[in-house]
UniProtKB/Swiss-Prot annotation:
It comes from Picea sitchensis (Sitka spruce). GO terms for molecular function: ATP binding; metal ion binding; methionine adenosyltransferase activity. InterPro entries: ADOMET_SYNTHASE_CS, S-AdoMet_synt_C, S-AdoMet_synt_central, S-AdoMet_synt_N, S-AdoMet_synthetase, S-AdoMet_synthetase_sfam. Pathway: Amino-acid biosynthesis; S-adenosyl-L-methionine biosynthesis; S-adenosyl-L-methionine from L-methionine: step 1/1. ATP binds at H15, D167, G168, K169, S235, G236, R237, F238, D246, R252, K253, A269, K273, K277. This is S-adenosylmethionine synthase 1. It catalyses: L-methionine + ATP + H2O = S-adenosyl-L-methionine + phosphate + diphosphate.
Amino acid sequence: MDTFLFTSESVNEGHPDKLCDQISDAILDACLEQDPESKVACETCTKTNMVMIFGEITTKANIDYEKIVRDTCRGIGFVSADVGLDADNCKVLVNIEQQSPDIAQGVHGHLTKKPEEIGAGDQGHMFGYATDETPELMPLTHVLATKLGARLTEVRKDGTCPWLRPDGKTQVTVEYKNEGGAMVPLRVHTVLISTQHDETVTNDEIAADLKEHVIKPVVPSQYLDENTIFHLNPSGRFVIGGPHGDAGLTGRKIIIDTYGGWGAHGGGAFSGKDPTKVDRSGAYIVRQAAKSVVAAGLARRCLVQVSYAIGVPEPLSVFVDTYGTGTGKIQDAEILKLIKENFDFRPGMISINLDLKRGGNMRFQKTAAYGHFGREDPDFTWETVKVLKWEKA
């Protein structure tokens, strides 16, 4: 039997790039909560003892940017210089301007356009992907890497592994077979975890705790065997982490945010962007489309692409590929027609249909760590499977 190996990685909420994503989305949440029409493009960068937010925000909301930055850092666990950043004593720099009036006029007519008339906030192309290899209809490599990272955070915050610090990375390699274009996971080949830790713990204790409290609860036992390889803090020491260890920047973990290297990616990041930015809203609607196709049993894998021009509401193109896994109910050309009939790709209508103007409740901040897709949370409206209506031959 021909098999192949495929790998996906994830990073923890305390990774400096992910810290930046969460700050950018915390600011988006605050703006949308007070003013659902807020136009937000908020970037964050960080290094030792410093966080800077910069970008373009037009909103009626009254926002204390510095407080949001400090609260977000503190919530993640950055409470002292020892762990990589001190939320209460670091420098916070704010350089926020208003959205360009040229863009405002072209996209939403300075808020005068009806929802169906709102144009895309920029050009670009986005991809949505789904696969039947997991209940989440997501790639197993990505699901496991992401859940391992989330579990690391859980056992750090609940005191199970008090030696853990916020920064960390995970990576999972799975052996697959290709079954007529569908991906069938056979076993987990390698599990890699590199986690920040305090000075007190030994490498043996780290390995034992990670196996018992992180890997065992996350990786289903049927995928593990005597040949599974475990690399647990293989560099030997990871005390210095967070922004002290590496600089961080919003939008540098776009594959972790999506499908772990499966499917395709148009290159646009999500965090800190309001729903007129099709990098985000377009990617969300095509995930819902691809997921709905697989959930309907029309294909075992599905990739959907959409593309836009700035200021133009209708998409320039919609593409679908089922990798030859169509179940024979209808062909790809008909699936494409079905997608166009069942999903409205105009940005203003995506915002309404997926309720993307609603902030608060950490709505978007939650998306900024451990993946935007495959999550069971009512706030992730794009994960709702839409029942597709079509004429059965």
